[in-house]
Amino acid sequence: MAPAQRCPLCRQTFFCGRGHVYSRKHQRQLKEALERLLPQVEAARKAIRAAQVERYVPEHERCCWCLCCGCEVREHLSHGNLTVLYGGLLEHLASPEHKKATNKFWWENKAEVQMKEKFLVTPQDYARFKKSMVKGLDSYEEKEDKVIKEMAAQIREVEQSRQEVVRSVLEPQAVPDPEEGSSAPRSWKGMNSQVASSLQQPSNLDLPPAPELDWMETGPSLTFIGHQDIPGVGNIHSGATPPWMIQDEEYIAGNQEIGPSYEEFLKEKEKQKLKKLPPDRVGANFDHSSRTSAGWLPSFGRVWNNGRRWQSRHQFKTEAAAMKKQSHTEKS
């Protein structure tokens, strides 16, 4: 028996030697694993001709699992606040260690030879990527400069509008002269000084006295109705019984029971028992309170107590005929 070997793709131990890599299950697992890695490799290959440079975000720290090397590889290449998309993955795919591990992986797992070139990056392609990365950095710097210029222009525009507002407020304005009735130009500074001096000096103007409020003015007086004391009803301050301690008249008149009586409870209990029985049973609608006569049962002859059966039968027929004849005569 061949020694036990562990397959990392199938995640199981086998004892068939090299024959396991040719099995259908192993080839299916190998194909699925390569297809999971292939979209990331294809996206990295597209970045060779046109490298993209973006501002760094925490999502750029994402890693992917290299199936050939058996290790994690960073997808993007970050430096400072800049990130080159798929720079880390392309650098790993172009390394000689990855090429050596890929050849070993393909030989051990007997993968398709046509797919091996998709997971390798030649030094020429990586050099082309470096050139496109330089162009991407230049274009990113141009975009950043353009954005900075636009922001600076917007800031200058806001600052200019603010200065215009301040200038329009501080401009000298014409203040009308109340003595001559004509308008004479005065400066804002002079007017401010005049207002300040007038505030400092005590005013000589005689202000009219404030009107004194007469609270005892004559007018329609209020009518005193008197103390509204209900006779016979006390107050808690006078030592009377609180309202919630006084018994109601209905309670005093008759001490009535709360809830149904015991007989009603038994009737209701019996009804609840009958509800559980099938509604289509025999005698479900029978009124037990109705009175029935003694002869309500159907008569099939006399009860056979003693003697012969035919004697009781003949006696019953004779009595029935006599009763029938008697009833017929009564009706006529």
Curated annotation (Swiss-Prot):
Biased amino acid composition, Polar residues: 190-204
Modified residues (N6-acetyllysine): 31
GO biological process terms held by the UniProt record: chromosome separation; mRNA splicing, via spliceosome; negative regulation of centrosome duplication; regulation of protein catabolic process
Region span, Required for centrosome location: 1-169
Subcellular location: Cytoplasm, Cytoskeleton, Microtubule organizing center, Centrosome
Keywords, ordered alphabetically: Acetylation, Coiled coil, Cytoplasm, Cytoskeleton, mRNA processing, mRNA splicing
Coiled-coil annotated residue ranges, if any: 137-168
Residues covered by region (Disordered): 169-213
Transmembrane segments: none
Record's comment on post-translational modification: Acetylated. Acetylation oscillates throughout the cell cycle, and the acetylation state at Lys-31 is regulated by the deacetylase SIRT1 and the acetyltransferase NAT10. Deacetylated CENATAC is responsible for its centrosome targeting, and acetylated CENATAC promotes SASS6 degradation by enhancing the binding affinity of SASS6 for APC/C E3 ubiquitin-protein ligase complex/FZR1.
GO cellular component assignments: centrosome; cytoplasm
Function: Component of the minor spliceosome that promotes splicing of a specific, rare minor intron subtype. Negative regulator of centrosome duplication. Constrains centriole number by modulating the degradation of the centrosome-duplication-associated protein SASS6 in an acetylation-dependent manner. SIRT1 deacetylates CENATAC in G1 phase, allowing for SASS6 accumulation on the centrosome and subsequent procentriole assembly.
Description of how the protein assembles with itself and partners: Interacts with SASS6; the interaction increases with CENATAC acetylation.
Annotated disease: Mosaic variegated aneuploidy syndrome 4: A form of mosaic variegated aneuploidy syndrome, a severe disorder characterized by mosaic aneuploidies, predominantly trisomies and monosomies, involving multiple different chromosomes and tissues. Affected individuals typically present with severe intrauterine growth retardation and microcephaly. Eye anomalies, mild dysmorphism, variable developmental delay, and a broad spectrum of additional congenital abnormalities and medical conditions may also occur.
Protein name: Centrosomal AT-AC splicing factor
Organism: Homo sapiens (Human)
Gene: CENATAC
